[in-house]
């Protein structure tokens, strides 16, 4: 798949040394020329971003960033001065956080699969070694474009079509945790938008309720949940979202009501397209839990066969232990 870069610029944010380090910006005075190397770099950044855990946001009414972005989209300003303003705002906001260390600031407008995006990221540099033409070993630095967690992306196409959307802005949650989310919320003057975790949990509840109102037996319910899981797993593997209408077509109609109609009538508040969350969806086909030194996980279809639950006595009986567990028990008896 190809990527079409329309405008891109790099700036530097440096951290000064000393007892009270500060962040300084070094701004380019022209845009980067679009070359195969530039487009290959952006394709790798795009692919890496696609694979990362992301949160969704929307701009606040008073967002200065949103106002400047709107001026750019309305062609009231050019990309370069817009990027200068963004770099200064990012540096000013980043300086408030203890993880601030500077890096290469990338701001790029590109098109991928008929969708326009604005990509903003702060990329670290890494040190490595190279062998030159004289077979001497020298140090070199390179942009770490696969491992980064300070980045956001705005779906300009989505924003143009529906300014009331709750999913046009995404940003990486990051290994630093909530602080990264707070940082980008403040930098963009944004607030939480779509909540994928909540949407997935609501979807699972809707599936259970759908089976209940259809008066399905336990085996039939497990089969429906397995169908849901297989569909969602396929969407995850292909990098696609859960389409409620497609999922509904894959499930049986119960009491003359299909799944999509059921969710609308019961007002679950589900989006038509839901970003899948793998860990949440696992509960469709697995039971798992831990506590007091015990961790248990098993496939749902084994309940009532190899695993017998006695709710009254609060016990779970396992018929046929896993071979490796049995061997460990035998060695340590």
Curated annotation (Swiss-Prot):
<comment type="similarity">
    <text>Belongs to the YejK family.</text>
</comment>
<dbReference type="GO" id="GO:0043590">
    <property type="term" value="C:bacterial nucleoid"/>
</dbReference>
<dbReference type="GO" id="GO:0005737">
    <property type="term" value="C:cytoplasm"/>
</dbReference>
<dbReference type="InterPro" id="IPR007358">
    <property type="entry name" value="Nucleoid_associated_NdpA"/>
</dbReference>
<protein>
    <recommendedName>
        <fullName>Nucleoid-associated protein APJL_0454</fullName>
    </recommendedName>
</protein>
<dbReference type="Pfam" id="PF04245">
    <property type="entry name" value="NA37"/>
</dbReference>
<keyword id="KW-0963">Cytoplasm</keyword>
<dbReference type="GO" id="GO:0003690">
    <property type="term" value="F:double-stranded DNA binding"/>
</dbReference>
<dbReference type="GO" id="GO:0003727">
    <property type="term" value="F:single-stranded RNA binding"/>
</dbReference>
């Amino acid at each position: 798949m190809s990527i079409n870069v329309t405008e891109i610029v790099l700036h530097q944010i440096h951290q000064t040394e000393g007892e009270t380090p500060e962040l300084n910006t070094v701004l380019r005075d022209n845009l980067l020329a679009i070359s195969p190397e530039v487009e290959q770099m952006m394709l790798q950044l795009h692919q890496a971003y696609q694979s990362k855990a992301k949160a969704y946001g929307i701009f606040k009414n008073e967002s200065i960033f949103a106002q400047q972005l709107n001026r750019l989209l309305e062609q009231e300003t050019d990309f370069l001065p817009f990027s200068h303003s963004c770099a200064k705002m990012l540096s000013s906001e980043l300086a408030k956080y203890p993880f601030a260390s500077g890096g290469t600031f990338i701001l790029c407008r590109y098109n991928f699969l008929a969708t326009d995006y604005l990509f903003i990221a702060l990329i670290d540099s890494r040190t490595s070694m190279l062998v030159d033409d004289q077979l001497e070993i020298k140090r070199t630095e390179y942009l770490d474009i696969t491992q980064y967690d300070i980045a956001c992306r705005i779906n300009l196409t989505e924003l143009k079509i529906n300014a009331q959307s709750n999913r046009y802005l995404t940003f990486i949650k990051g290994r630093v945790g909530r602080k990264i989310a707070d940082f980008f919320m403040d930098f963009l003057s944004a607030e939480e938008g779509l909540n994928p975790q909540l949407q997935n949990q609501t979807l699972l509840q809707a599936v259970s309720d759908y089976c209940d109102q259809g008066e399905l037996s336990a085996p039939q319910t497990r089969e429906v949940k397995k169908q849901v899981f297989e569909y969602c797993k396929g969407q995850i593997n292909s990098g696609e979202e859960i389409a409620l209408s497609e999922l509904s077509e894959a499930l049986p109609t119960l009491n003359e009501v299909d799944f999509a109609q059921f969710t609308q009538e019961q007002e679950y508040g589900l989006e038509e397209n839901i970003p899948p969350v793998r860990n949440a969806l696992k509960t469709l086909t697995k039971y798992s839990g831990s506590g007091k030194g015990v961790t248990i996980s098993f496939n749902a279809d084994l309940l009532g066969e190899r695993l017998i639950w006695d709710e009254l006595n609060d016990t779970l009986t396992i018929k046929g232990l896993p071979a490796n567990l049995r061997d460990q028990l035998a060695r340590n008896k």
